[in-house]
């Protein structure tokens, strides 16, 4: 039976309580839980969807997938994406947890994630039966580990450090991953 570790964010409670006592308040970036009110547009959409009984499609609606592609074109200047390649999930946590499994990773494979990182990267590796390795530089890994790397996570802006990877750092990561045939997945949940 697979045993997953306790969720490490729970151990941060005393630190969060101490930070909350600071006279200037606190910007809690520890887990990314939304703190702003739900926008009116989203509230209306949820109300309208309340009477849409039945299960959703497993791959989202055509309109949703097209909206994602249009967003990338409008906000990121990325054109030519295929709506059929969009994988809607409930949130990034679900995607991060399941990507290693969806890629077919398993025993003997390595998933690399940043040293200071969201714990779900490691949980996703465990769910797939792969090994999670915390490293900020693939070239620093022992050769016998590096040759087993199949997935590399980047996180920019990073949680919890706030660090932003520049183009040169991303290029080094992509080049190193290509050298071992690994997929690079950029978790950019704080990009906006």
Locate each region found by the language model.
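Conserved core of the PLP fold type I
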Residues: 52-176, 191-192
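Residue-level marker for buried hydrophobic side chains located in beta-strands
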Residues: 184-185
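Walker B catalytic acidic pair
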Residues: 188
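N-terminal small-domain helix-loop-helix segment of the aminotransferase-like
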Residues: 2-91
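Residues within alpha-helical segments
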Residues: 17-20, 126, 178
């Amino acid at each position: 039976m697979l045993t997953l570790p306790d969720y490490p964010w729970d151990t941060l409670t005393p630190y969060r309580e101490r930070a909350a006592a600071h006279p200037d308040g606190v910007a809690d970036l520890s887990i990314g839980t939304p703190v702003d009110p739900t926008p009116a547009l989203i509230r209306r959409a949820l109300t309208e969807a309340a009477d849409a009984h039945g299960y959703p499609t497993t791959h989202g609606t055509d309109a949703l997938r097209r909206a994602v592609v249009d967003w990338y074109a409008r906000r990121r200047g990325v054109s030519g994406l295929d709506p059929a390649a969009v994988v809607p999930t409930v949130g990034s946590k679900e995607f991060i947890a399941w990507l290693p499994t969806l890629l077919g990773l398993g025993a003997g494979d390595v998933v690399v994630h940043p040293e200071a990182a969201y714990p779900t990267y490691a949980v996703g590796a465990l769910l797939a039966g792969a090994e999670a390795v915390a490293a900020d530089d693939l070239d620093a890994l022992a050769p016998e580990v590096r040759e087993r790397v199949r997935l590399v996570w980047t996180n920019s802006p990073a949680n919890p450090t706030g660090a932003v990877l520049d183009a040169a750092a991303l290029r080094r990561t992509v080049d190193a991953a290509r050298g071992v045939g690994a997929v690079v997945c950029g978790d950019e949940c704080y990009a906006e």
